Amino acid sequence: MPSFGTLLSLSTLALLIAVVYQNPEPLIRPITGSIAFKIIQQLFEHTHCYVTVKTNSVDLPYAECFSVANGKFKRVFLDETSYDVVKDLRKGHVLPGLWDGHGHLMQLGELMDSVNLFGAGSMDEVQKRLVQYKALRQEAGTSEQWLRGVGWDQANFEGKWPVAKDLEINDKFKDLYVMLDRVDVHCIWVSDKVLSLLPNPTPEVPGGEIPADGVLCDNAIDLVMKYYPKPSNERRTKFIREAMFELNKLGIVGIHDAGVYPAELVLYQELSKNESWTVRVNAMVECEARNTFCPDDVANISTPDGRLHVQSVKLFADGALGSWGSAMIEPYSDKSSSGSLLVDAETLTKLTHKWAKAGYQVNIHAIGDLANRLAIDAFEEALKVLCPDSTLRECQSKYRFRIEHAQIIHPDDQRRMHELGIIPSIQPTHATSDMSYAESRLGKQRIAEEAYRMRSLLRLNPVFGSDFPVEPANIFEGIYAAVTRRSPRTGLDAGGGTNGWYPSETVTLEDALDGFTINPAYAAFLEGKAGVIEAGAYADWIVLDEPIETLDMEALRKLTVKETWVGGEMVYRRTGPVPLPWIKN
């Protein structure tokens, strides 16, 4: 057995080598260039080789091998002969790890523990799913743990809003606390038991609407949330871990978490220290009171390993299109309403400036064209004050203001976005999910000129996401929707054809991949660290059975990931038979 002195000497040598290896300054480069050092260096590296490696790097777009140490890529090269020892030879085709540019981590985990109402085509189907869920969850519906669900759509109820009485399915349901989120999570549908908690008469809420007894939308939701029993940290931890596993399964290594409360950030910071934290999170702060300034409740966070990043805030300009809540310049085509703003223009501008001055990137939820106009106004005014001695475009490159959804934008405001360089955060599957009703709601002209822009905004390097759990957290479905403008569920457009819905707004496969890799990295101040396979970047990658660029587009609808790696560690491996994707001839 080696003596204590020998072990101490070896430990000291190893530490010295590690320091030299991590700090190759000019004075010690002769050491790092020696054959002996290269041999020792391999002890700290692990090398992986695949059939192809798509890197997203300008210097070397495609490679075959890379080495990893301390959670980062160290070298990327074409073949194993350019390196002395190959430590891991694998089959498969590699892409940089995928990022979802707009999702909701906690809500995804909570949905996985709730009633899934997506696709429920009738009131009977909703009630059937609630009864089935309750039979398995006796604790659901108590005052301590409400029965939760998400995914209903009044369009499936013959266009009529549901009411609280619809939730009294049988005698067992009459005394239950039930809260169900609409498909866009901008409205809730609650039981009479929940309504009994509210003041009588129910007060009017600026920026909120109560379209039916038991349905509350946008700011009116806050009336109920005062009484909602928040899940314990134990349950929240369960939500997060289950959601992260689901995301890893889909090849997702990082997300922009679009609205995290201060109390949740405390839990995030604690959990991010553990190995079970397998998704990088760029979190947007959302104050407990929406559209306020709460810097004392949060702090900028950037963990050394890059697992948690907090440097942005989320504000809300309007609601959602599906519930007529998005704020429009002109009234809807199918309703004598223009939607509603959740905040006035002056407050939005002041909040933007205050948050930016406090060191936070500002991301504004805006769907309607009026909301998008006010968001652009707020950004422009803030930039003028923040950088009086530089151009607005230069200032924007520093602060990187974003519009979340950027769904309906007047042509004049599209030009302003390009002039300022405002980053659009787009969800391609929103276009294909909304196409069945969007034209009747907005009219053909607004759809053709303003709505669901993708190709029109490419010069702004748009961030792509899914808005999970509103849409499935499947990036390949998002890529399919962006490239084809067809539903990833059916493969068809709004008319039942295959031409695509307003196909002039399609993007290329390469553009779509950028939207889920390098563009989210830039929008999170992580360029060179995420969305790319090159020296110094986080060692995050996914493995597919075939190169994605060789696949027929229809294969994307069923594509699955073979492996997902985060920080050089495998966090997901597919089991079972390998699916056979359709390959181009």
What are these model-predicted stretches?
Residues 2-296, 311, 315-371, 395, ...:
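Divalent metal-binding segments
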Residues 77-83, 301, 415-417:
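Short loop/helix-cap segments at secondary-structure boundaries that form the rim of catalytic
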Residues 156, 197, 432-433, 551:
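Short glycine-rich, flexible loops that bind phosphorylated cofactors or substrates
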Residues 238, 353-363, 370-401, 405-406, ...:
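His/Asp/Glu-enriched, well-ordered alpha-helical/loop segment
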Residues 271-275, 298-308, 417-421:
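Acidic (Asp/Glu)-rich catalytic clusters
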Residues 553, 574:
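Short, solvent-exposed loop/beta-turn-alpha elements that line the ligand-binding surface or hinge
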Residues 567-569, 575-577:
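Beta-rich accessory regions
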